[in-house]
Amino acid sequence: MSATEELLGNAQHYATDFGKGDLPMPPAKRVAVVACMDARLNPYGLLGLAEGDAHVIRNAGGVVTDDVIRSLLISQRLLGTQEVILIHHTDCGMLTFRDDDVKAQVEADTGVRPSFALEAFPDVTGDLRQSLARLRASPFLSHLDQVRAFAYDVETGQLREVN
C-alpha cells in the first residue's frame, strides 16, 4: 500500500467521527504561525493548537516570502489574526545547500533554471532576523506589534526566542 492510500484510509476514519463542521473560519486564538515544513516539527503539538485555533503557514525553511506575506495579508485583514509566530529549527535542510548550486543542477537536468529564490540560509538565527525584518517592512500587514520569532531544537523540543 502506498503512503497516499494509507493516508486516505486515515482520512475516512477521521470523517466517521467528525464533529468540527461548525468551526468558524477565523482562528479562535487570532494567531498565525509561519513554520518550516520539516516533518520533525509539529506546530500543533508544539504549541498546543487544535483545529480552529490558528492559521499555520508552512514552507521550506519557514521563510517569509511574497507568498507568506500574501497569506498573512488574508489572515490579518480578512480573518482577524493579530499575532504572528515564526518558527525555524535546528538541523534544517535549508542549511545544507546554496541556491545557485541547486538551480544549476535543476537547469542541467531540465534545461530550465528556476527563476525564484530557493531561500537557503547559512544560519537559523540570522534568517529568523531577516524574516522578522521582511514582515516589519511589509506595507500589507496590519498587525506587526505582536510578531515573535523562535528557533525550535529538533533534539530537545525546546523553543528559543530570537529578537
Go through the PLM ranges and name each one.
Residues H13, D17-R70:
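Conserved beta-strand-loop surface patch within small alpha/beta domains used
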Residues V34-C36, R58, I87-H89, F150-D153:
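Short beta-strand segments
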Residues L79-H89:
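Ordered, amphipathic secondary-structure segments that act as subunit-interaction surfaces
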Residues M37-R40, T90-M94:
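Gly/Ser/Thr-rich loops at beta-strand to alpha-helix junctions
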Residues M1-P27, G62-D67, I74, L78-L79, ...:
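Divalent-metal-activated hydrolytic enzyme cores
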